[in-house]
Amino acid sequence: MSRVAKAPVVVPAGVDVKINGQVITIKGKNGELTRTLNDAVEVKHADNTLTFGPRDGYADGWAQAGTARALLNSMVIGVTEGFTKKLQLVGVGYRAAVKGNVINLSLGFSHPVDHQLPAGITAECPTQTEIVLKGADKQVIGQVAADLRAYRRPEPYKGKGVRYADEVVRTKEAKKK
């Protein structure tokens, strides 16, 4: 059995937590995040800590409590420090540029690709082949990064495409005659 739910989440100073039934709202310097938790989870807020436990009558109570603890911990980190995700563009002529909340990508297609960023996510391009995504919501950052990568996934022969900065692309050997 996982014991993730038994560890409390420490709420730092400057972070405001509101519990309204199963709806949790966490507000900090990087914004405000809201999440609705499963009915099997009971959350208590006391002494700048959030504690989690199962409600009676639910078979998966501890599992749902562990999930809720991990999600709320990510929310607290997001509103205090924020999350970043770095992407690299590998390939001749592959470029990225940010204009407002739109990322313009040149990925070898006959047309440029414009990707609209959701609210709360910012992007910057330190170089033409790097994209840095920043925001408070870990799930949204990961989804935007996955959407950008899906436009041109790294291919296995030369490794060209959009990849995460920490991703290792395994390359295949070319066909021999």
UniProtKB/Swiss-Prot annotation:
The modification N6-acetyllysine is found at residue 44. Gene3D superfamilies: Ribosomal protein L6, alpha-beta domain. GO terms for cellular component: cytoplasm; cytosol; cytosolic large ribosomal subunit. One of its GO terms (biological process) is ribosomal large subunit assembly. The keyword DNA damage does not apply. The keyword Acetylation applies. SUPFAM superfamilies: Ribosomal protein L6 (SSF56053). Coiled coil: none annotated. Pfam families: Ribosomal_L6. Keywords: Acetylation, Antibiotic resistance, Ribonucleoprotein, Ribosomal protein, RNA-binding, rRNA-binding. GO terms for molecular function: large ribosomal subunit rRNA binding; structural constituent of ribosome. Belongs to the universal ribosomal protein uL6 family. Part of the 50S ribosomal subunit. This protein binds directly to at least 2 domains of the 23S ribosomal RNA, thus is important in its secondary structure. It is located near the subunit interface in the base of the L7/L12 stalk, and near the tRNA binding site of the peptidyltransferase center. This is Large ribosomal subunit protein uL6. It comes from Escherichia coli (strain K12). The gene is rplF.
